[in-house]
Amino acid sequence: MAMSCKDGKLGCLDNGKYVRYTPEQVEALERLYHDCPKPSSIRRQQLIRECPILSNIEPKQIKVWFQNRRCREKQRKEASRLQAVNRKLTAMNKLLMEENDRLQKQVSQLVHENSYFRQHTPNPSLPAKDTSCESVVTSGQHQLASQNPQRDASPAGLLSIAEETLAEFLSKATGTAVEWVQMPGMKPGPDSIGIIAISHGCTGVAARACGLVGLEPTRVAEIVKDRPSWFRECRAVEVMNVLPTANGGTVELLYMQLYAPTTLAPPRDFWLLRYTSVLEDGSLVVCERSLKSTQNGPSMPLVQNFVRAEMLSSGYLIRPCDGGGSIIHIVDHMDLEACSVPEVLRPLYESPKVLAQKTTMAALRQLKQIAQEVTQTNSSVNGWGRRPAALRALSQRLSRGFNEAVNGFTDEGWSVIGDSMDDVTITVNSSPDKLMGLNLTFANGFAPVSNVVLCAKASMLLQNVPPAILLRFLREHRSEWADNNIDAYLAAAVKVGPCSARVGGFGGQVILPLAHTIEHEEFMEVIKLEGLGHSPEDAIVPRDIFLLQLCSGMDENAVGTCAELIFAPIDASFADDAPLLPSGFRIIPLDSAKEVSSPNRTLDLASALEIGSAGTKASTDQSGNSTCARSVMTIAFEFGIESHMQEHVASMARQYVRGIISSVQRVALALSPSHISSQVGLRTPLGTPEAQTLARWICQSYRGYMGVELLKSNSDGNESILKNLWHHTDAIICCSMKALPVFTFANQAGLDMLETTLVALQDISLEKIFDDNGRKTLCSEFPQIMQQGFACLQGGICLSSMGRPVSYERAVAWKVLNEEENAHCICFVFINWSFV
C-alpha cells in the first residue's frame, strides 16, 4: 500500500489511485487525530457520521489517512531524535578535542620539566603566569602579573580579587595549572556522566568534571549557585553582600556551612567570594574562592564548633552549545583542614576521589537529572503520582533531617543529655521549629503525642567490609537488626492519630519502588511493614506501617562513594509536606586496597567463582573491584516522645542503638572476606573443591533423572561446569534437606530472581518464596521428589526476598546425589522467569 504525500492531502486506495482531500477535510482529520491517533473501525465510522465534511470519504480511506499520519509523526519524532543525538555528538566531539588539546599541552609541559626545576624552583602561585598553557577560553583574559597586589574591602579591591580568581579558575578548568589524572573506575564513553579527573600532588584536594547538559547556561548557573539543593552536606549558604560590576557581572560575599558527615568530626564553614561574569566568547563563569586576612579584604569571625576550611579558586565554566544545551567545566579545589580530625578519619578529608563523588559529580548529576525531567513530556508524573521536583524535595528532606540529627547543632535547639563521653550520644530538641514540622498532620481531633525529639547516635569503625555490600544487607534483611516494636513506636510520632505496637508480632516487609536518579546511584522507595501496629479506633485490625527510605552508594565498583540508608516513618496519606523524623546509617570508606578474595559469596560454591586456578580473581577487570579496608559507620535514630518519658526513652534508645551496633558488627564479620576464607578453610588458592564437586553433582543428577543435559555446553573440567552453571540463564537454586529447607546456593540468575546476595541467601527458607498455591503444589509434589527423584512443576508465581512477585513458565526439582548415591540436597530450576 502506497504512502500519502507529506502534506497529508492525498490518500491511497487499493487500486493505486489517490484521493485528494480538501484543506477543510485535512483540518478536520488533524483535529480528530490529536484526540484519537489510532481510532478503531467503529470509531472511524462514528467520526464520519459526526463530521459531515467527511461524509464523502470511505472508511477505508480514513483508515489509510490515519496510518499515514501516524507514520509521518513517527518519522518526525525520529528525525528530531536523530538531530538531537547529532547535536550532542557534535558537542561531545568539541569537548573531547579541547580535552585532547589540554592533555597535549600538559604532556608538553611535563616533557620540558627537568629534575633540577622540580627540586630547586620554589612552588609558584597557582596560575598567575600560565601563559604557555593558555586555555581555549582565556583569550582576551589578562592574567595578573603582580604577585602581591594591594587590595582592600572596597569594590575595586574585591573586583581585583575576583579577576584573579577567574584567571586561576580558568587555568585549572581548561589549562594545566593542576595535574589532573583520570578518576579511578570512571570509564569514558557516550553514556558516561562526563570526563572526571582528580588532582595529583597539589595543595589540598581537587576534582574536575566536564560534560554536556541539556539546559541553557543561565539555568545551569542558577542551579549550581543553589548549592544546598544538590550538595547534601551543605547546611546553608548566606549571601552577605552583592556588588555589581561594570561588565554586567556580580561579586558576592558568601558564608557557607557544611554538615559533618560523622559524629567523630566537626563541621566546616567557608568565607567566600563568588564572581559571576560573561567572557568575550559568550561563556558564563561562576567562580569562587575563600577570602583570607592576608588579602586585606572583608573578614568573617570564626564560628564556634566550626572549622574554617579554605576553598581555592573553583567554579563553573558554562558554554552554550549550538542547537541548545551547555558544555560545563566544573572545578572543586579545597583545603579541608584534615589535621583537625582524628588521624583515622583524615583520608576522608585528604582524598580527591571523595571530593569528586560528593561535590563535583553531584553537581553534574543534578544538572543531568533536571535536564532529563525538562525533556520529558509535560514533566511526566511518576512515583505514586509525584512529580520529579516533589520527589527530589522529599529526598532532600530525608538527607537534611539525618544530617541535622548527626550534627545536633545548638542553634537548632539540640542539647546533649547524660554523659557526652558515652559510646551512644543522646541529644534532645524541643524547639518549636522542630516540633511544628513533626506535628504538622495532627488536625483530626487527636492531641499531639510528641513534644520532644530525642536522637540516639553513634559512630563505629569497620574493618575489611565494603560499604555497598553491608548496606545492601541492612536494606534487604531489616529483621536482622530492627526491632518491630521500635518501628511501631517511631511510626506513632507521625500518624494522624495515636498508634501502639503489637508486642511480639512480626509482619511481612514489602519494598515498593518509588523513584531513582538517572544513573541509579540513588533511589527512593517505600517500605511497607505489614500488621505491626493498631490504632485505638480499631484495636483488632492490624495497621500497616510505611517507611519512606532513601538509598545511595549501592554500587560496589564506585570509588570514594558514601553509602547511605536513611528512612523515616510516613503516614499512609504520603503528603508532600508530611512530617519526617529520619533515622538510618551512613558508611564512609576511609581507604581502599585490592581485595584478595571477593566477599560477595557463600561459604562454599561462590568461592570458586571468584578465585581462578592461579589464585587470582576470575575477572580481568580488577581496577574497579577494590574493597574498602576501613570505613566509618554513623548511626542515628530519632524518636518523637513526650517530655515526661525522656529518661525512659533515652535508656531504651541507647540500648537499641547498642543492639544495632552489635548486629552490624556480627554482619560485618560474616561479610568479611578473611572471615569467610577462615570458615571455609581454604588450603590452596585453587578454589574450593566442594564448589566444583557440587556443580558436577547437580549436572550429573539432572542428566540421570531427566535424560538430558542441564547445561548446553558441558565440559569435562569441573571449573568449566561451575562457570557454565553460574551463568545459566534460568534460575538454579539448591536447598537443604531439612524439616525447614533453607537455600544453600543459587546461580546468578537465581540471586537476581530472589533479589538477594550469596551471603544472605542462607537466611531464606524454601517456603517463604512460594505463595499459598505454590506451597500446596510443593507439598503435594515433595513425596514424588523424594521417591522418584524428580518432579516437574507447572508454571506459577513465587516471591523474591523483597516480596516482589515472580512468574515462571515451569520448574523442575530433583535430588542432587553425591558420589555414594546419597541425597545431598534438592535443586530447583525456574525456567523463563520474570518479575510481574
Curated annotation (Swiss-Prot):
Coiled coil: 72-115
Similarity comment: Belongs to the HD-ZIP homeobox family. Class III subfamily.
Known function: Probable transcription factor involved in the regulation of meristem development to promote lateral organ formation. May regulates procambial and vascular tissue formation or maintenance, and vascular development in inflorescence stems.
GO molecular function, one term: DNA-binding transcription factor activity
Gene Ontology annotations of biological process type: cell differentiation
Domain of life: Eukaryota
Gene3D superfamilies on file: 3.30.530.20, Homeodomain-like (1.10.10.60)
Membrane is among the record's keywords: no
Protein name, per record: Homeobox-leucine zipper protein ATHB-15
Tissue expression notes: Highly expressed the developing vascular elements and the adaxial portion of cotyledons. Expressed in developing ovules, stamens and carpels. Expressed in procambium and shoot meristem.
SMART domains: HOX (SM00389), START (SM00234)
PANTHER family named in the record: HOMEOBOX-LEUCINE ZIPPER PROTEIN ATHB-14 (PTHR45950), HOMEOBOX-LEUCINE ZIPPER PROTEIN ATHB-15 (PTHR45950:SF1)
Domain START: 151-379
Pfam families: Homeodomain, MEKHLA, START
Outcome, altering G189D: In icu4-1 and icu4-2; gain of function. Delayed in juvenile-to-adult and flowering phase change and increased number of vegetative leaves, which lack abaxial trichomes
KW Nucleotide-binding (keyword) present: no
Keywords for this protein: Coiled coil, Differentiation, DNA-binding, Homeobox, Nucleus, Transcription, Transcription regulation
Residues annotated to bind DNA: 14-77
Record text on subunit structure and interactions: Interacts with ESR1 and ESR2. Interacts with ZPR3.
Record localization: Nucleus
Species annotation: Arabidopsis thaliana
Cellular component, GO annotation: nucleus
